[in-house]
């Protein structure tokens, strides 16, 4: 049986995430970092769900990814900080999807589903009456400490998110997703160049200095 490109991406993503090594973390180091992080303190003071809210705020301030009334699909949305920002800055129909439980967000539709399963595509279609102006993805697999492994895993999730973007964006729409430093490359970069007019990479100030994450912003989707 010959698999389609879409089927290969779904299968590859699951295999990459399943076989990667588990990371050994230091809870003490993590707690100390949280205490000293100004964006953590700001998020707590302003009632944000997480410091990640400031990443998408800064991305939007630089690249204007939201327009008033835009509909937004937020992939891997938990705990919901990007969803809240999307509602504040766009305010259109907003669908947040994650395999994890999420507390409700006023005016957002929340779907608990595994994006690695093709059934999620059908669920999104049932919940949305039209395609989306913006597709977001802050998805990242837990890191292992092994740079090449972490890059491969994050690249796999970015490819998965791009697949959803191509399926669900309106003509002229915008895709914003987390990638690792070095940006997009290989098949993912070719896919984005084929489907979008402009592609930029940006590391917002809210991204921790020691983090390898950066973001790809692809605008002008060609339906």
Please identify what each model-predicted range represents.
Residues 68-78:
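Conserved class I S-adenosyl-L-methionine
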Residues 79-90:
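Conserved SAM-binding loop of SAM-dependent methyltransferases across substrates and taxa
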Residues 70, 92, 173:
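Glycine-centered, small-residue-biased loops immediately flanking beta-strands
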Residues 155-171:
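A short glycine-rich, Lys/Arg-flanked "PGG" loop and its adjoining helix->strand segment in the class I
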Residues 2-68:
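Class I SAM-dependent methyltransferase Rossmann-like catalytic core
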Residues 181-223:
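Class I S-adenosyl-L-methionine
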Residues 97-144:
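S-adenosyl-L-methionine
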Residues 172-179:
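Conserved beta-strand signature within the Rossmann-like core of class I S-adenosyl-L-methionine
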């Amino acid at each position: 049986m010959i698999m389609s490109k879409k089927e290969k991406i779904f299968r590859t993503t699951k295999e990459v995430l399943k076989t990667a090594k588990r990371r050994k973390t230091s809870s003490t180091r993590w707690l100390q970092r949280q205490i000293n992080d100004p964006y953590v303190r700001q998020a707590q003071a302003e009632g944000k769900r997480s410091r990640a809210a400031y990443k998408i705020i800064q991305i939007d301030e630089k690249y204007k990814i939201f327009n008033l009334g835009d509909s937004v699909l937020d992939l891997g949305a938990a705990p919901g900080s990007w969803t809240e920002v999307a509602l504040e800055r766009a305010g259109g129909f907003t669908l947040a999807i994650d395999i994890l439980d999420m507390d409700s967000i006023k005016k957002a539709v929340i779907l608990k589903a595994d994006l690695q399963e093709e059934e999620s595509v059908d669920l999104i279609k049932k919940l949305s009456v039209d395609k989306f102006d913006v597709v977001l993805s802050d998805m990242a697999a837990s890191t292992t400490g092994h740079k090449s492994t972490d890059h491969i895993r994050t690249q796999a999730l970015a490819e998965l998110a791009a697949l959803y973007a191509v399926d669900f964006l309106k003509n002229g729409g915008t895709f914003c997703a987390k990638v690792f430093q070095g940006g997009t490359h290989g098949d993912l970069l070719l896919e984005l160049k084929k489907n979008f007019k402009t592609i930029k990479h940006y590391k917002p100030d809210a991204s921790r200095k020691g983090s390898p994450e950066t973001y790809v912003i692809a605008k002008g989707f060609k339906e």
